[in-house]
Amino acid sequence: MVTQPIPEFQGRIGRTLEESEPYFPAKQHPGGEAPNVVIILMDDTGFAQLGCYGSDIDTSHIDALANNGLRFTNFHVTPLCSPTRAALLTGRSQHSVGMRSVSNHQTGFPHQLGHITNHAATVAEVLQSEGYATFCAGKWHLAPTNDISAAGPFDQWPLARGFDRFYGFLEGETDQFHPELVVDNQHIDAPAKMEGSYHLSEDLVDQLLKMINDSKGIRPDRPFFAYLPFGATHAPHQAPDEYLRK
């Protein structure tokens, strides 16, 4: 985690109000040239399934992102959800941050805590401390199973690990048509939509865009970090009919 030092008071306290001078610390801002950062994570998806890496599967939108963004082709992934997320968000080996396996398991040993160790900072915590707005919409799977009920504790939920806002689900999987959802630190009911008109992937994108628009509408100069970890390519495999017909 990133701990913020308490700003030293630089005003003056006199015997009267006239003799005193208030002090308001400046808000942290990364500067005008700081870029917006968007990370999209697809669950249980191999690189050979993407058109930009030679697949025959139509992934035109993903291909456009790859062609117009950055490709990081030397990242170590595991065939498990939580370890890859822990490594991606910390930039460190999953073993060194307490996540050798999925967060469902806690062994009582430092390499498998069921969450990212508090001695490691996430990229969201680092950017948040530098003045970024930070948003997460999607699958978390970085908190112990026993700690994700409505009663908490909330110390390993997204808002405690560097994100200003969260919309998504905390476990490893959820029904894509009738998901179990959390907003910030509160469990909510799934949106009431007509059968066949709702899919979680679209909802996640819509909610993330709302977060960004809300932030930019009030502080347009503030850059954002958006983390969008989809859950659709993980079990249960539930695609909209238009994709099943292909």
Protein language model regions, located:
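Formylglycine-dependent sulfatase
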Residues: 1-246
